[in-house]
Swiss-Prot record:
It comes from the Bacteria. GO terms for molecular function: ATP binding; glycine-tRNA ligase activity. The gene is glyQ. This is Glycine--tRNA ligase alpha subunit. GO terms for biological process: glycyl-tRNA aminoacylation. It is found in: Cytoplasm. SUPFAM superfamilies: Class II aaRS and biotin synthetases. The lineage of its organism: Bacteria, Pseudomonadati, Campylobacterota, Epsilonproteobacteria, Campylobacterales. Tetramer of two alpha and two beta subunits. Keywords: Aminoacyl-tRNA synthetase, ATP-binding, Cytoplasm, Ligase, Nucleotide-binding, Protein biosynthesis. It catalyses: tRNA(Gly) + glycine + ATP = glycyl-tRNA(Gly) + AMP + diphosphate. Belongs to the class-II aminoacyl-tRNA synthetase family. InterPro entries: aa-tRNA-synth_II/BPL/LPL, Gly-tRNA-synth_heterodimer, Gly-tRNA_ligase_asu.
Length: 285
């Protein structure tokens, strides 16, 4: 099963389970949780079932395209079901079967691993899912988002698509993953992404102008707060996301000290909380 087919299979399966399929959000983000369809839609008492591919950027994890299993940008497949179905774990296991895995012939373990995002003011009870010793999925039951307790507990299922693909295709190097294949011609993950891994690593670790980025961070925060004064949660949240990504680039660049780090995280959390509160208020209008 190619990388593309894994995505198509998961989209089809979760659509059959009642999820709408939305598209990736057009802002850099460190994880699928940052998407408005998760962060904001987890709030309120309205049921919400959604699935989508989440391109994710973590600048500090870049390795110039030289590490066989570590990437500065990668893909998650995100599922949110609110409220959480009682059989969510069963639904997940059936999704693995849809991908061609015989779950009776593999060691599948749910390892307790409660999740927290300090920048988003979010946390939940959770488990890592290990497939024959390799983590492939994170399960989380959201308890709080943007510092606000969740009225309905959402189940978040986050697949690591590259890890699943490496397992399903029996590859030891992420760049050898078969992205697509037709008429005997193979396109690999490396064909699609290796150059970008090198160039973004070069930028994030060596070239990024820290003075400009520090100013961007402050400007994004100011704009977010200014928008929130008008009660507009969604455009404000865009600037919260930009501030978070800018922080991540500064962190990769080595420009943020240990003592500064907590201050930056608290600033982003304040923005995220403001967006969450504004969104929650909009639901009551």
């Amino acid at each position: 099963m190619t990388f593309s087919e894994i995505i198509l299979t998961l989209q089809t399966y979760w659509h059959e389970q009642g999820c709408i399929i939305v598209q990736p959000y057009d802002m850099p983000a460190g994880a699928g949780t940052y998407h408005q369809a998760t962060f904001l839609r987890s709030l309120g008492d309205k049921p919400w079932n959604v699935a989508y591919v989440a391109p994710s950027r973590r600048p500090t994890d870049g390795r110039y395209g030289e590490n066989p299993n570590r990437l500065g940008s990668y893909y998650q497949f995100q599922v949110i079901m609110k409220p959480s179905p009682k059989n969510i774990q069963e639904l997940y296991l059936k999704s693995l079967e849809r991908l061609g895995l015989d779950i009776n012939k593999h060691d599948i373990r749910f390892v307790e691993d409660n999740w927290e995002s300090p920048t988003l003011g979010a946390w939940g009870l959770g488990w890592e899912v290990w497939l024959d010793g390799m983590e492939v999925t994170q399960f989380t039951y959201f308890q709080q988002v943007g510092g606000i307790p969740c009225e309905l507990v959402s189940a978040e299922v986050t697949y690591g698509i590259e890890r699943l693909a490496m397992y399903l295709q029996d590859k030891n190097n992420v760049y050898d993953i078969v992205w697509d294949e037709r008429d005997g011609k193979i396109v690999t993950y490396g064909d699609v992404h290796k150059q970008s891994e090198y160039e973004f690593s070069k930028y994030n670790f060596e070239i990024a102008d820290t003075a400009i980025l520090f100013k961007h961070f402050e400007d994004y925060g100011k704009e977010c707060k200014a928008i929130l004064e008008h009660g507009l949660a969604l455009p404000a949240y865009d600037y919260c996301m930009l501030a978070a990504h800018t922080f991540n680039v500064l962190d990769a660049r080595g420009a943020i000290s240990v003592t500064q780090r907590q201050d930056f995280i608290l600033k982003i959390r304040e923005l995220a909380k403001g967006c969450a509160l504004a969104y929650k208020e909009s639901l009551q209008k």
